[in-house]
From Swiss-Prot:
Cross-referenced Pfam families: ThiG
Name under which the protein is recorded: Thiazole synthase
Family classification: Belongs to the ThiG family.
TM helices/strands, residue ranges: none
Subunit comment: Homotetramer. Forms heterodimers with either ThiH or ThiS.
EC numbers on record: 2.8.1.10
GO terms of molecular function: thiazole synthase activity
Subcellular location: Cytoplasm
Taxonomic lineage of the native organism: Bacteria, Bacillati, Actinomycetota, Actinomycetes, Mycobacteriales
Organism per entry: Mycobacterium leprae (strain TN)
């Protein structure tokens, strides 16, 4: 079996599926889904949880030995995101942050200018920064240049389930990146997750596709299998696409023709 571990910053992970927690009906279902996914890293919206010891979510992640990845979800400016990251570091004793700076509430698309400003400040402050970014190769490259530990381009807007709208751009981001690329947002079903890995992404981050599924634990297990399948397919190397058919057993075909003559 091909080795599947990958590294972000100073941490190495076995699972290439990163989970989010938003949209879960309750903690019991979320727990089943997290276990089924096999994830080792799960995002936490720092502005939406009680960090003073009363958060059932944080206790759940601790019990399951899953590393929490605080994010700056809901922030609209670099200043707001930096402050939220600082609060997360103090509350959770971690310098890891998933950086989100959105342009508006309707699309939840990243604000590239504010994102870069926040990334520069957080990297300078010693954070391991994982930015949620547009599927823009130039912006992803700029974020990598600031010192981000990974880049996390969207497949499509958060929660839409539209899959990967611009696979070519994702391939470009992967080709030029020297840090891990994590497909983040827009995953709707297993084929989307597998495609992300086939395009060369190092991991997939998803939440709604599991938490809002009819059967979240089963979907979580399916997503884990899809990520593994896509990763192995990428490593194995797909056959080139051809315009014309090509017999899979040419020698046998010729022998049959000779017998027919």
């Amino acid at each position: 079996m091909v080795e599947s571990k990958f590294t972000i910053g100073d941490r190495t992970f076995t699972s290439r599926l990163i989970m989010g927690t938003g949209g879960a009906a309750n903690l019991a279902i979320l727990e089943e889904a997290l276990i089924a996914s096999g994830t080792e890293l799960t995002t936490v919206a720092i502005r939406r949880v009680d960090t003073d010891g009363g958060s059932g979510l944080l206790k759940l992640l601790s019990r399951l030995d899953i590393m929490p990845l605080p994010n700056t979800a809901g922030c609209r400016s670099a200043a707001e995101a930096v402050l939220t990251a600082q609060l997360a570091r103090e509350a959770l004793n971690t310098n890891w942050i998933k950086l989100e700076v959105i342009a508006d509430e309707r699309t939840l698309l990243p604000d590239g200018l504010e994102l870069v400003r926040a990334a520069e400040q957080l990297v300078d402050a010693g954070f391991v920064v994982l930015p949620y970014t547009n599927d823009d190769p130039a912006l992803a490259h700029r974020l990598e240049g600031t010192g981000c530990a990974a880049v996390m381009p969207l497949g499509s807007p958060i929660g839409t389930g539209l899959g990967i709208n611009n696979p070519h751009n994702i391939e470009i981001i992967v080709a030029q990146a020297r840090v891990p690329v994590v497909l983040d947002a827009g995953i709707g079903t297993t084929s989307d997750a597998a495609l992300a890995m086939e395009l060369g992404c190092d991991a997939v981050l998803l939440a709604s596709a599991v938490t809002r599924a009819v059967d979240p634990p089963t979907m979580a297990a399916a997503m884990a299998s899809a990520v593994t399948a896509g990763y192995l397919a990428r490593r194995a190397g797909r056959i080139p696409k051809r315009f014309w058919a090509q017999a899979s057993s040419p020698e046998l075909m010729r022998t049959g023709e000779e017998l027919g003559n």
